[in-house]
Amino acid sequence: MKPEMILFDFGGTLACDPIYNMEEGNSAIFPYITENPHNVTKEQFSNFIKELFDEIRVLRGEFIELHEHIFLRYVLEYFDIKLSIPIEEAEWIICKSLAENVMTPGADKMLKTLTEKGIRTGIVSNLCWSGAALERAMGELFPEHKFDFIITSSEYIFRKPDRHIFDMAIRKSGLKPEKIWFCGNFIEVDIIGAKNAGLFPVLYDNRDIPDRFHKYNDTSKIDFPYHHIGGWGELIEILEK
């Protein structure tokens, strides 16, 4: 059965898995500081963020997400730092400075084909960035494409593979789960998570681009129907059969 909607993961699927420059990204808001009474340096600021985030990652586990606005607000108030810009803009500046978003090969053509075929699209991403930040990033990467909705775990508490975040996407779609496909690059999180929520999984496994999840992906874990594609052209071929 052909899908009425295809949902996508973001990092490693629609966009290449980024290489983050944490210190450069975290210190990118320093030109916008209006008050820094403790004379916190860029290095101190970045190191504190890394240590705090590592602690939070342990506390939250694998299935609950932190929102970047809350995290950044804590850090700024901890150091009594004030900015000349709102927290939303500070988030975007950090996001842009951490890494450059680059679409995976042929993603734009694939999305155009889906639009032409009347197949709706959406994004479900494990991300501490706000949904607004991801929407902004997608607008830059795919200016001619309109997603029905974009869901980040930061806005909806739960992280893939927890079923709740997939259920939210299904509710937003207004469709039955069997009419939706989910494309992702991580078997444990995307493929198994989607299957458990009743969606049809598509493993995006492009070995021509760097992806930190390649080494974790073991297809022997998959004992259910799914599509395994090495590029977006293969997805188009499947849809045109």
Show where each model-derived region lies.
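N-terminal helical cap/lid subdomain that shapes the substrate entry/recognition surface
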Residues: 2-112, 116-117
